[in-house]
Amino acid sequence: MTADKEKKRSSSELRKEKSRDAARCRRSKETEVFYELAHELPLPHSVSSHLDKASIMRLAISFLRTHKLLSSVCSENESEAEADQQMDNLYLKALEGFIAVVTQDGDMIFLSENISKFMGLTQVELTGHSIFDFTHPCDHEEIRENLTLKNGSGFGKKSKDVSTERDFFMRMKCTVTNRGRTVNLKSATWKVLHCTGQVRVYNNCPPHSSLCGSKEPLLSCLIIMCEPIQHPSHMDIPLDSKTFLSRHSMDMKFTYCDDRILELIGYHPEELLGRSAYEFYHALDSENMTKSHQNLCTKGQVVSGQYRMLAKHGGYVWLETQGTVIYNPRNLQPQCIMCVNYVLSEIEKNDVVFSMDQTESLFKPHLMAMNSIFDSSDDVAVTEKSNYLFTKLKEEPEELAQLAPTPGDAIISLDFGSQNFDEPSAYGKAILPPGQPWVSGLRSHSAQSESGSLPAFTVPQADTPGNTTPSASSSSSCSTPSSPEDYYSSLENPLKIEVIEKLFAMDTEPRDPGSTQTDFSELDLETLAPYIPMDGEDFQLSPICPEEPLMPESPQPTPQHCFSTMTSIFQPLTPGATHGPFFLDKYPQQLESRKTESEHWPMSSIFFDAGSKGSLSPCCGQASTPLSSMGGRSNTQWPPDPPLHFGPTKWPVGDQSAESLGALPVGSSQLEPPSAPPHVSMFKMRSAKDFGARGPYMMSPAMIALSNKLKLKRQLEYEEQAFQDTSGGDPPGTSSSHLMWKRMKSLMGGTCPLMPDKTISANMAPDEFTQKSMRGLGQPLRHLPPPQPPSTRSSGENAKTGFPPQCYASQFQDYGPPGAQKVSGVASRLLGPSFEPYLLPELTRYDCEVNVPVPGSSTLLQGRDLLRALDQAT
């Protein structure tokens, strides 16, 4: 039994030993095959003998794929000569990088031997590996895009070449330090490589091969040359004369530039500081430079490629720039950009202008020639110089730009008295036309112009500093004549240049109402309105028209002008559509006479005449002097805003005539009905209450506010009493009348436009409600007399008002559709205007207080004003 067991054991051991020996034999044979394969690789024996099996297989596969690529790309008839083989060894030494062949899957099937010089990793270590194992993860997507065909293989050679060219940047691991030491792969750093090449397509089977019975798909690979970008701080080779350094901010603005740019391109380093480099790029290269800038900010280094930089005096030069981002060693933040600029050519097309900076060179070469004309050292006559200058400028009109003075040039004044020209008198036989008697007309109408007639847009102003608004044009230092007579001189005396210039500057064209109205409508009147502060604490602004002296109470015979009829300028003149039968029946003669007179009045009276034959309006004064007598200042000075309204109201013709202080003629504008519809939306119109009164004294804002409160209080008391009278005399305590009065009071709100103000004080600003209240002199509303024509009223009734004539120089007219008949009583006044299509806008107390004008130079009550305010309060 034991012998059988021993025999079985020995037989099993023999089989195991035989299997082990067979395995050793197979492995030895495999090793021999691998070594034979390694020796077949185009590698040195010292390298191939130390390869493991995996490396041998990896390198062998890469070699076979490379050989297939070369065999498909290169033609069969090409035979390498010995000279070409010798030159192959010199190519790698001359190149600034290494060559790599990458398949469409990312396998590096070939790498040149000099890769270890730049990257530290050897050819054997990288060949056959995937490129994604040694590149930056952020660049993988860009690498994949460059490995594949973007637009397909194409059908033509041209389309194939355009779609297969590649130029990109990638970051790869580098084990070589700046000092030349080699570190471990785990301690490797990223180095930016500039990769340029193309994608090649080849067949899987060699040509004319019978082994490939079936059609195999096409293969593609990327053949690139990878050039590392050298850091500026590690440059050992000195820069040549065709290279200059520059430093930029992160947005490519120059912060430093080498002096060699002056002789290379023509720019001074100082004139480049602070300017962007994009200003000097050629327009066709701006897109590529923008892409290079993006790569620089993303990857830290970039090579711009060949581009054109504009020269200073025209043309451009070809450059290539290597940019590097310099990081702050403390916080590792980007600090600046260092650029090494290689000038590749001379200035090309220097006679072509590509930018505005190059236009300066157009006139610079001719400066010496032009200045020689005015050189006083020459003995050439003045006439010859003038003729030469005229011919020169006629041939080259662009030289006129150089004759204009530039900042820093000396300005030479021209002396007109140095040359005497004998010219015939141009005005010897000049005769004034009979229709334009200048001197005689001026002398005959001198009194009238001094007293009444005002030119358009002129207002007398005192030269008080602080109270006048600066005119449209600055004051001139030269003296000007005070009247047109000063422009005349005898024919024996020579004409003055100053007077001639002022004569040509005057506007001598006749102005008709249409043209003047057009000129006036072009002005922006809203910007000329008085300043109204939103809060009551703003600084006081002086009005455009300063305070004027008191006007005499005696009426003047000459017609005066004011701005109460300014609405006729801005409103369409449609008397037929607006007046209605109420006005046309009562005042046909007045309208006809007014129309006849307006055809012959000058523009100043048409614009500013209020029809007042009495005293002068406060907004007008004595006859203004023309522009020539104001020291060269512009006469575009504006009076206060006209007292107009937004909304329409009834136009009490008879009442206004009763409130006038003097006997007015029939043809005055005081009695004419309005000739414009109540649609004045472009201009802000204010009532006479807001406009303020310019009487013998100027009312302060505090006094106006106090008077408004007293007027409101008296109005409510009086209307309550009047309502009780109309309702049957019920006492205020009764429920029906008191409740009805509260409802009416809430409707009125203190500022109801349908109820007049009952103020009888002579010291308050006159307005339409004040004038209406003076008709009855304290009578209730239901006892108001019906309207009467102005002819039935006498001057005695007008004198009952007791107001100073200065306050009523300009009458205020309300514009609106006519009413059928005057109604009496409070209830009738509330219900009467309901059929009218227009109503006055409701003004709140805040609106009234905000729109109070700021008159005078004092904001506090003083002297007589304070006494009047105290008297009214008590």
Curated annotation (Swiss-Prot):
Ranges where the bHLH domain occurs: 14-67
Q: Where is region (NTAD) located?
A: 495-541
The UniProt PTM text for this protein says: In normoxia, is probably hydroxylated on Pro-405 and Pro-530 by EGLN1/PHD1, EGLN2/PHD2 and/or EGLN3/PHD3. The hydroxylated prolines promote interaction with VHL, initiating rapid ubiquitination and subsequent proteasomal degradation. Under hypoxia, proline hydroxylation is impaired and ubiquitination is attenuated, resulting in stabilization.
> What Gene3D superfamilies does its record include?
Helix-loop-helix DNA-binding domain (4.10.280.10), PAS domain (3.30.450.20)
Residues that the record marks as modified (Phosphothreonine) are 844
Annotated region (Disordered) at 1-23, 438-489, 777-803
What changing residue 194 to A does, per the record, is:
Decreases heterodimer formation with ARNT
Q: Where is this region: DNA-binding?
A: 26-53
Q: Which residues carry this modification: (3S)-3-hydroxyasparagine?
A: 851
Effect annotated for changing residue 171 to A: Markedly decreases heterodimer formation with ARNT. Impairs heterodimer formation with ARNT
PROSITE patterns, sorted? BHLH, PAS
Entry GO terms, CC:
cytoplasm; nuclear speck; nucleus; transcription regulator complex
Keywords assigned by UniProt, alphabetized: Activator, Angiogenesis, Developmental protein, Differentiation, DNA-binding, Hydroxylation, Nucleus, Phosphoprotein, Repeat, Transcription, Transcription regulation, Ubl conjugation
Q: Does the keyword Ubl conjugation apply?
A: yes
The effect annotated for residue 192 to D is: Markedly decreases heterodimer formation with ARNT. Impairs heterodimer formation with ARNT
Residues forming the PAS domain are 84-154, 230-300
GO biological processes: angiogenesis; blood vessel remodeling; cell differentiation; cellular response to hypoxia; embryonic placenta development; epithelial cell maturation; erythrocyte differentiation; gene expression
Q: Where is this region: Required for heterodimer formation with ARNT?
A: 171-192
Q: Where is the composition biased (Polar residues)?
A: 443-452
Summarize subunit and interaction data from the UniProt record for this chain: Interacts with HIF3A isoform 2. Efficient DNA binding requires dimerization with another bHLH protein. Heterodimerizes with ARNT; heterodimer binds to core DNA sequence 5'-TACGTG-3' within the hypoxia response element (HRE) of target gene promoters. Interacts with CREBBP. Interacts with EGLN1. Interacts with VHL.
- Role summary: Transcription factor involved in the induction of oxygen regulated genes. Heterodimerizes with ARNT; heterodimer binds to core DNA sequence 5'-TACGTG-3' within the hypoxia response element (HRE) of target gene promoters. Regulates the vascular endothelial growth factor (VEGF) expression and seems to be implicated in the development of blood vessels and the tubular system of lung. May also play a role in the formation of the endothelium that gives rise to the blood brain barrier. Potent activator of the Tie-2 tyrosine kinase expression.
Q: What is this protein called?
A: Endothelial PAS domain-containing protein 1
Look up and give the organism this protein is from.
Mus musculus
The organism's taxonomy opens as: Eukaryota, Metazoa, Chordata, Craniata, Vertebrata
